[in-house]
Amino acid sequence: MEKNYTDKELELVFEKILRMYKSSYSPKENPKVFLLGGQPGAGKTGLENMINAKDEYISISGDDFREYHPKFKEINLEHGREASKYTQQWCGAITEKLIEALGKEKYNLIIEGTLRTAELPIKEATRFKKLGYEVGLNVVAVKGEKSRLGTIQRYEEMIKQGKTPRMTPKEHHDLVVNSIGNNLETIY
């Protein structure tokens, strides 16, 4: 998909989010990172809340950065339930920059992903170990029907709360559901 933002827009938002995190958290002498995985709608946010009960970790989830996209409102108006496809590249770029910057400075992190592939969590674990981090991988797995229903319920709940909803495309959800078992076997 064609890039729908400028490098300058990305850099400005990245710097804003980075400042926000740095103003609320401090680097650690013995940093920890938790890599969270699971299909969309499985309950990763609930697991994240349990791990971060004392608010000691910066939580990085690409979905949290959609609303910062410079054309977020227009994309949502034009594409509705499919809008997440048009902000995915943006979310990935912001996420990668934050992981890189905060990782080098040794902040405690929680990084949320889907385990759509085995390569990314292996790459991240290796990178963080080289930086001196204690690395943990936590996975939430439920039946595909339950997680698909979870994505629909999340979408409807966001509408009720007056938030801009995001819908996980069924094909993406199903891809992760069908891949996660083999990917976990590869990782372990």
Predicted regions and their residues:
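Conserved GTP-binding G-domain of TRAFAC-class P-loop NTPases and closely related GTPase folds
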Residues: 149-188
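ATP-dependent NMP and nucleoside kinases share a basic, alpha-helical "lid"
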Residues: 115-158
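N-terminal pre-Walker A segment at the start of P-loop NTPase domains
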Residues: 1-26
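Conserved nucleotide-sensing/catalytic segment adjacent to the nucleotide-binding pocket
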Residues: 55-131
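The conserved Walker
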Residues: 39-40
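Phosphate-binding P-loop
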Residues: 23-31, 102-103
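Hydrophobic positions on the alpha1 helix immediately C-terminal to the Walker A/P-loop
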Residues: 47
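Conserved lysine of the Walker
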Residues: 44
